[in-house]
């Protein structure tokens, strides 16, 4: 089956095998995030439930290794006309939240900001306006720091809201800038590992300060960790 109880150990093992230092998650609920944290004690996470700003509903959580990164600041805002509290924006079907963290890389001494989100699966206007909102938030950040934006954008690489980010002059899809790309499939599998698609709906955007050595869409598990494929 595809239940969380069956998938959770393989999610944790996949993460630990690849030794991700920092990563964004989507659709995780509080108990699922706590399960992962218990199985991966080397990680901490930040984020809130989208429904109440506490523990209710899905998170757009960011996991990180405190051994590698120091969390300097963090926050959350909603993908809506009112970013300050849980509410649906524009024509969205669901409440959507974005979590961000400001991190110090203890190895390099560099500081950066990581935004992580899950855009609406129905609202066309909501997705485009969410992309514009993210760019506004980046521009309004009090310090000009390198930026990472990860998430489930619910659109592929040809869609308007993707192109708003890709052509912004602020961010670029890591797929397009990496020295090496390992992507033998798209990122949506609907729990069917043999499904093939050219569509990438999960993206990692980076500001120009980042040098991308490798980009990968990981399919290396017999049991699908999720209905979308890990993007690194």
Q: What are the residue ranges of the model-derived segments?
A:
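Metal-dependent phosphoester-hydrolase catalytic domains
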Residues: 125, 129, 138-147, 155-232
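Active-site-proximal beta-strand/loop segments in catalytic clefts of secreted hydrolases
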Residues: 1, 26-29, 48-51, 65-66, ...
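Glycine-rich, highly charged phosphate/nucleotide-binding loops
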Residues: 2-14
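Extracellular/periplasmic catalytic domains that process cell-envelope and extracellular macromolecules
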Residues: 16-17, 38-39, 53-56, 91-95, ...
């Amino acid at each position: 089956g595809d239940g969380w109880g069956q998938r959770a150990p393989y999610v944790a093992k996949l993460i630990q095998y690849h030794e991700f230092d920092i990563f964004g998650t989507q659709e995780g609920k509080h108990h699922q995030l706590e399960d992962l944290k218990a199985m991966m004690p080397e990680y901490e996470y930040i984020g809130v439930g989208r429904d109440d700003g506490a523990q209710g509903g899905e998170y757009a959580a960011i996991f990180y290794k405190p051994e590698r990164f120091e969390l300097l600041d963090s926050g959350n805002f909603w993908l809506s006309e009112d970013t300050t509290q849980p509410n649906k924006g524009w024509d969205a079907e669901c409440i959507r939240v974005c979590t961000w963290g400001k991190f110090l890389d203890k190895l390099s001494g560099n500081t950066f900001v990581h935004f992580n989100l899950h855009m609406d699966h129905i609202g066309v206007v909501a997705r485009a306006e969410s992309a514009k909102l993210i760019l506004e938030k980046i521009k309004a950040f009090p310090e000009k720091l390198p930026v990472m934006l990860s998430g489930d954008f619910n659109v592929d690489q040809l869609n308007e809201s993707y192109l708003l980010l890709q052509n912004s002059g602020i961010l670029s899809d890591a797929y397009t800038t990496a020295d090496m790309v390992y992507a033998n499939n798209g990122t949506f599998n609907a729990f069917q590992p043999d499904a093939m698609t050219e569509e990438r709906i999960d993206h990692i955007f980076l500001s120009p300060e980042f040098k991308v050595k490798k980009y990968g869409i990981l399919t290396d598990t017999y049991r699908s960790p999720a209905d979308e494929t890990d993007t690194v």
